[in-house]
């Protein structure tokens, strides 16, 4: 299957052809630049990420920190360096960067190991209502679809915290309680 650029893929998926897709790419690159990030989506190819996601499960088997590091490396490879994250050489290099065992990486890439876990992730995302990426889930109860402003994330994180850490509700008055100045009974 021939690869297509991100702009071509977006134009096909959302309509308007490559020109409309390129406008979307330009906007994403501009938003990233406002945050001090250099995205090279205009050079990136739209590729499948099944093997990358399976390696993320391998990394999680080692530790959450390793999975986070691999995710960051894969995102940088794709968005910043415009690398093909379906290419096994790119995946091997990313895995090596975060210290994953090369033998285990080869075993996963040469098999379907973690395919079931990845499929479970897809089913869970569908159950959450995710229809695209990015999609963020906070505390298993709040979903944030797409690139949203920081205030949206702050609001959701605050709400999730408040939901799980309710404030004490005072019942009755404080007239018959003792305080730092003595008792008012």
Q: Where are each of the predicted segments found?
A:
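Structural alpha/beta surface segment adjacent to cysteine/selenocysteine redox centers
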Residues: 1-79, 183
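C-terminal cap of thioredoxin/glutaredoxin-like
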Residues: 57, 61-185
């Amino acid at each position: 299957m021939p690869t297509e650029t991100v702009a071509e893929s977006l134009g096909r998926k959302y309509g308007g052809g490559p020109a409309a897709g390129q406008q979307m790419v330009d906007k994403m690159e501009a938003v990233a630049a406002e945050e001090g990030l250099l995205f090279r989506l205009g050079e990136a190819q739209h590729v499948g990420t099944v093997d990358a996601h399976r390696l993320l499960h391998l990394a999680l088997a080692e530790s959450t920190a390793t999975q986070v590091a691999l995710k960051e490396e894969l995102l940088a490879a794709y968005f910043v360096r415009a690398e093909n994250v379906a290419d096994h050489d790119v995946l091997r290099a990313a895995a090596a960067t975060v210290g994953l065992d090369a033998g285990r990486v080869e075993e996963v890439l040469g098999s379907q190991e973690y395919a079931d876990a990845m499929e479970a992730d897809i089913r869970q995302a569908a159950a959450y209502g995710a229809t695209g990426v990015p999609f963020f889930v906070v505390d298993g109860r709040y979903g944030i679809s797409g690139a949203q402003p920081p205030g949206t994330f702050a609001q959701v994180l605050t709400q999730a915290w408040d939901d799980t850490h309710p404030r004490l509700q005072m019942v009755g008055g404080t007239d018959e309680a003792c305080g730092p100045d003595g008792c008012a009974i």
